[in-house]
Amino acid sequence: MSEIKKIATRDSYGNTLVELGKEHDNLVVLDADLAGATKTGVFKKEFPERHIDCGIAEGNMAGIAAGLATCGKVPFMSSFAMFAAGRAFEQVRNSIGYPHLNVKIGATHAGISVGEDGATHQCNEDIALMRTIPGMVVINPCDDVEAKAAVRAAYEYEGPVYLRFGRLAVPVINDEVTYKFEIGKGIVLKEGKDVTIIATGLCVNEALEAAKLLAADGIDAKVINIHTIKPLDEDLVVASAQKTGKVVTVEEHSVIGGLGSAVCDALSEKAPTKVMKIGVYDRFGESGPGAELIKKYELDGESIYKKVKGFMA
């Protein structure tokens, strides 16, 4: 049996920027002294004249990206999620979001899977922050195939986009030949009648693993991949909730303000349903290997399985 291919989505980001750079002269990449870590260094090597290192000044980087957008460029500003969404929030909101400029934010090292860098660098709040900015699209791809498609879709989209990428290498679960990406459209990975599991990012694969374990116990779980958290695919969420009667959300992010909150917002208005949110529960991260932290914070397939089984009791 062949080993499952694993790739970090930050690598997908950097490699796709190079591909797009060859196709489009107006693409410009900005970084904040982290080109090696965000993987935009490969773009810098290929197109040094279109790569701008802004130094450790993320707010300034957002302002520069905004200015470039007004000149017809398509800037991708890149940094760790903690800095792109956290430190630069004011400038992203006021300089990019308010005028609705065509800036793309490539945020790497999101969530607890950042690992050894610890709590100060593990951003579990970025989705919540970016969701609040009017007109901001928020995308959290689950694997290499989806990440590459998301970067391309972000380039084609006219307006601000926040792209969330990870440091940890994760299984490639999508087929590059058949996969289709559309902003705002969720993907049903497995049909089911007893409960709907809605996942995003690296938790999508874990949700699929949990569904296999649930099936062995006679629980038929529907699994949905929500790569676009804003705008949310409300039609799919509502229809699935009405079909199964119970919903579980899974995310490598705080349960406050992320995917779970977005799903609850939609269902409370259109189809009140019992929902269990699985994620980071009102706490900070800690230092340790990314894969081990996923297990400790109970975001792995077996932990999800146990929680869903308890929810169904």
Q: Where would I find each of the regions flagged by the language model?
A:
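Thiamine diphosphate
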Residues: 1-164, 169, ...
